């Protein structure tokens, strides 16, 4: 799958993309929002393994700028019955430029057209304001809030978002 917009090139992830994925992972782990997610691997073997796992999911897409042909992030989906749960991560150099919105909007339309998807879900920390705003701009609404923890030392309020196009 390949999609070009006026600013972006979006395609399926390949196993050979692991070095660029490693750069995205390292950048994410430095982010102030990393505490709201599981840490991403940074060792080559672990990055290769996770990249392969993502490739095998078949709903994992990478985003490149057209002008620099540089991978700037990814958008992925996990199918759960009739719902598609969305995840995304962009390198911090590309935040606040509309790339997350543009790529996610195009990929939601792609899943609607090619997979018959009409219900999308997402989870994010309520304190991750940029992520919450992105989801709301895409038409998602927060349907519930719950306490989330990925370890015994830290918990936070997570919002469960939904976009229902039925």
State where each predicted segment sits.
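Conserved GNAT-fold acetyl-CoA-binding loop/helix
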Residues: 29-51
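Acyl-donor (CoA/ACP) binding surface of acyl/acetyltransferases
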Residues: 1-31, 64-166
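A short helix-loop-beta-strand connector motif used in the catalytic cores of GNAT acetyltransferases and
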Residues: 50-62
């Amino acid at each position: 799958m390949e999609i070009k917009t006026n600013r972006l090139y979006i395609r399926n992830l390949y196993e050979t993309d692991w070095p660029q994925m490693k750069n995205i992972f390292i950048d994410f782990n430095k982010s102030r929002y990393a505490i709201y997610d599981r840490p991403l691997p940074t060792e080559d073997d672990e990055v290769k393994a996770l990249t392969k796992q993502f490739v095998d999911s078949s709903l994992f897409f990478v985003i490149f700028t057209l002008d620099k042909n540089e991978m700037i992030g990814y958008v992925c989906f996990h199918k759960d019955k009739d719902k598609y749960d969305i995840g995304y991560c962009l390198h911090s150099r590309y935040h606040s430029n509309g790339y997350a919105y543009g790529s996610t909007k195009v990929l939601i339309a792609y899943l609607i057209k090619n997979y018959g998807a009409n219900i999308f879900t997402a989870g994010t920390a309520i304190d991750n304001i940029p992520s919450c705003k992105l989801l709301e701009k895409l038409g998602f609404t927060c349907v519930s809030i719950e306490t989330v923890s990925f370890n015994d030392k830290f918990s936070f309020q997570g919002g469960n978002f939904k976009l229902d196009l039925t």
